[in-house]
A protein has these predicted regions:
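Expand to "…catalyze enediolate/carbanion chemistry for C-C bond making/breaking, isomerization
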Residues: 1-292
């Protein structure tokens, strides 16, 4: 799993030039340039051209550039790959992945293009079959990350989502477990009510607590709340620093554990503390460079 934060991952319609321009100034960690759901069938080819032109212009800074292509069993999937190779995106996101073989097929196709030699593959986890095959998909050596497609999944499962997402927790947790076992990134699904800040904050915190690395977003107004939810808080940073110091002092005195705030601190807690500090430092560096 990469140490690079993916707190906020914003969907942008791939064929809308005005949105592509605005995205250059949005403080999101990553952008999904969408050629699938956000583009009508009659506009697929023109959207592809528009996106490639804008990616070649650049200006997206250190934001990770992710292109969601159309499935390879559609009339546009292979054409998407051929076209975007020139723009050298960081990641290609494959929608509606059901089995690991689909990732392998994409990897073989991408290997034909010099511009995609360093491009990674992420999978949309948004079908019942895909969820059941999550461990196999996550273990695919070509795969670097997963993204939950909670809207499509809810539709296919015929479930109703409330504020707790209780009807989907088993699917979410299975994918987190598969991703962690494989050591890859995993991103939570979208929150549709983009004007409900309280609801967004609660769902972002829930996703963080479930183990997700970040959350996909449908509106720029959601970025700040989600960035804060998935970043270490000042309280967490302070605790991490004190745990590191206390354990070091305990070790120097021949002890295998320390006590901080009345709780035992072992080596595993210190490893987590170092990860918290490192993540905080990377986020600060990213934000400085992104805002330049």
């Amino acid at each position: 799993m990469t140490s690079r934060p993916y707190r906020s991952v914003l969907y942008i319609p791939g064929g809308r030039e005005s949105a592509l321009n605005k995205a250059r100034n949005i403080p999101t960690d990553a952008i999904i340039f969408d050629l699938e759901d956000a583009v009508a069938a009659t506009e697929k080819v023109s959207a592809r051209k528009t996106l490639v032109q804008q990616l070649l212009v650049g200006g997206y800074g250190r934001r990770t550039k992710i292109v969601r292509i159309n499935s390879l069993d559609t009339p546009w999937g292979f054409g998407d790959i051929a076209a975007i190779a020139e723009a050298t995106p960081d990641i290609i996101l494959l929608p509606k992945v059901n089995i690991a073989a689909e990732i392998l097929e994409l990897g073989v196709e991408m290997s034909k293009y010099e511009g995609l030699k360093k491009t990674k593959i992420w999978a949309m986890m948004e079908t019942p079959r895909g969820i059941l095959n999550a461990p196999e998909i996550a273990d695919c050596i070509e795969l670097d990350g997963m993204v939950m497609g909670t809207n499509d999944l809810a539709k296919d499962l015929n479930i109703r989502l409330d504020s707790t997402r209780s009807s989907m927790l088993s699917a979410l947790s299975l994918c987190v477990l598969a991703a962690r076992a494989a050591g890859i990134t995993i991103i939570d699904g979208v929150f549709n009510a983009f004007k409900d800040d309280t609801g967004l904050r609660c769902e972002a915190v829930q996703g963080r607590d479930l183990g997700f690395d970040g959350k996909t977003l449908i509106h720029p107004a959601q970025v700040d709340i989600v960035n804060k939810a998935f970043a270490p808080s000042s309280t967490e940073i302070d605790l991490a620093q004190r745990q590191i110091v206390a354990f070091k002092e305990a070790s120097e005195n021949g002890l295998g554990v320390a006590v901080v705030d009345g709780k035992i601190v072992e080596n595993l807690h210190v490893e987590a503390a170092h990860a918290t500090i490192k993540k905080s430092e990377i986020i600060i560096e990213m934000e400085i460079l992104t805002n330049k």
